């Protein structure tokens, strides 16, 4: 007993997958079938015991803070957009308490709202900036409407701007609503659990994550995908790495799946 194997090498995952799997699913949906065991090796834990079946909604917010530039020696003549941005970043922590629902399926179990990137403003030290732009990465539990989080962010921004005499524009630069999760008893989840048990002698369990993978696109197309690999918790950190031993052990698990060895487990 052996399973036919298909391998999809797709681009653009970090920026929305419009030119990668999204393009493939749109133009060649015949390549995939609801009976396929679709495994995306893009998330996991150090023991190789997490099978990801659900992902949070993703939204990237862009905040443009507008003030009035002036010479730094006469700050009263301007409106400091950097100070406004700093105040707003601090105020936006209120989102955590407004949307504090928890779901134990996910790690972490709550929605997260994290300021990440700030664009350069003035090139010199002696100028009060009149415009600052920063971004916030939001990973929102599926039951929370993204529209409500945008509205809350704008309400918080309005409070800061009215106090400081600034203008703030809040834009959703990227949104990806959560797909329906892969059922924990889906065939692909069971097959992975049996293969992990046979190869590694460990029990793997279904879980959800805040990160985004191409599995979301499969799920939105009605294809129950699972995400699995053995991963050291170093994603997007300095000196990100994986261990060769983990890769070799994962290869054995995939070989077990390919050969149908999980059926005998």
Where are these regions (language model features)?
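Acidic/histidine-rich catalytic neighborhood of metal-dependent amide-processing enzymes
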Residues: 1-54, 262-265
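Metal-dependent amide/peptide-bond hydrolase catalytic core
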Residues: 43-48, 53, 59-265
